[in-house]
Amino acid sequence: EPISPCKVAGGSVVESQSESLAETPLAALHRELGGRMVGFAGYALPVQYPAGIMAEHLHCRNAASLFDVSHMGQAELRGEGAAAALEALTPADVAGLKPGRQRYGLLTSPSGGILDDFMFANLGDRIFLVVNASRKEHDFGHIAAHLPQGVTLHRHEDRALLALQGPGAVPALAALAPGLAAFSFMGIGSFDIGGVNAIISRS
């Protein structure tokens, strides 16, 4: 069964055409597929496709649907001491996270207040981060401001970020990369998808 392209999930949308909106790497494809583009967290994203929201909802519940979440913030922490540097900013256990695993965490202020939630993963030689769209400038600025010498933050503004959701998600991806069939919850790794190297996680 085909995978349905679906609207971005959560938050609020603004249909004003006067605002200056950023676009994800998949914006042209959304328009080609008939997506109705609206403003969401400063980006032009599809709120629905011609089949309608109900059809999209049911398809996601019964099969699998692909969501463009490229508006979220992606970055990597590199350098010796990267895990310790991030652990100083979150109560989550970063140093104890094994390669190929990811974890949910809270980004905190120096006084211990919660600034945002985020995901982080151990990719072996670097730590991969995903933060919320509406807070990414603040979050990445906060992280960068507290990094010690030798640890650097590298943002990935040009990368797409997709969420494949639904009971058919694993079979759909496993057909393209067989190793994904045995992928465990909160795992992450690099896979070849149609000749493209992709970082894929299950969360």
Description of each model-found segment:
Residues 3-203:
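Basic, glycine/lysine-rich polyanion-binding surfaces/domains
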